[in-house]
A protein has these predicted regions:
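Exported/periplasmic cell-wall-interacting domains
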Residues: 101-102, 106, 125-231
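Acidic/polar residues at beta-strand termini and the immediately following turn/coil
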Residues: 27-29, 75, 153
Length: 231
């Protein structure tokens, strides 16, 4: 997994000089960081690309919380995921939040990562949505889609995941099943910047408005991914 050199800082400084305080910059999704398999599978999607509402597209935003650079912060209330950058900035991604995602909050770490992971429906999903196959191979037809980042706490799997989606039209919404869904493009982008051991702060319900709260949520500790590079 390659990390890329910061270049947006130069652009950001220019914008500050020309237009005053910059607070929110749209960061268009690109194929930067895609591998050969990504390009092949993403060119043959079994669903139509969705028109994601502008607030839920990838942005670089001001961030005044105290989590360390390299930390992932999930604000389920407002359907945003933040990847904290240096100098009071963060990448903000729109997400869809499933019932499983509402059932857990706290501090976790990325314990496992997988490209185009298989999907193994949980007992709850089988009960709500079944009958479902016991195992679905990886690919764009799979609800996990492009990437899976599996969260662990105390060395144990929380069963909480950050992953892609084959239903991008639901980004920005609460949905009936799943954990934290991102567009496949955004899931690939985040995957290329985190690593096993990256700290993930999942805000408790009604503890949202993440970028504007100065406190460290839930006793968050500095991320192990403290050296952060960007495009």
């Amino acid at each position: 997994m390659s990390l890329r050199v910061i270049s947006f800082v130069v652009v950001g400084l220019a914008a500050l000089t020309l237009g005053g305080c910059m607070t929110d910059t749209l960061e268009p999704a690109t194929q930067a960081g895609w591998n050969t398999r990504d390009k092949l599978l993403m060119s043959n999607l079994p669903y139509q690309q969705a028109d994601i509402p502008e607030p839920y597209r990838r942005h670089i935003v001001d961030y005044t919380r105290k989590e360390a650079p390299g930390t992932v912060v999930i604000d389920s209330d407002n359907k945003f995921l933040y990847y904290v950058l240096p100098n009071g900035r963060a990448v903000r991604y729109g997400i869809a939040v499933g019932e499983e995602a509402q059932a857990w909050n706290g501090i976790a770490k990325v314990g496992r990562m997988e490209e185009w992971p298989p999907w193994i429906p949980t007992a709850g999903e089988q009960q709500r949505l079944g009958p479902l196959p016991a195992y679905v191979t990886g690919g764009p037809h799979n609800p996990m889609s492009s990437r899976g980042m599996y969260l662990y706490s105390g060395g144990k799997d929380t069963l909480y995941r950050i992953h892609g989606t084959n239903q991008p039209e639901y980004i920005g919404q609460a949905i009936s099943s799943g954990c934290i869904r991102m567009t496949n493009e955004d899931a690939i982008d985040l995957y290329n910047h985190v690593k096993v051991g990256t700290i993930v702060v999942v805000l408790a319900p009604k503890n949202g408005d993440a970028p504007n709260s100065p406190k460290v949520a839930l006793g968050s500790v500095p991320s192990e991914a403290a050296t952060v590079k960007w495009y």
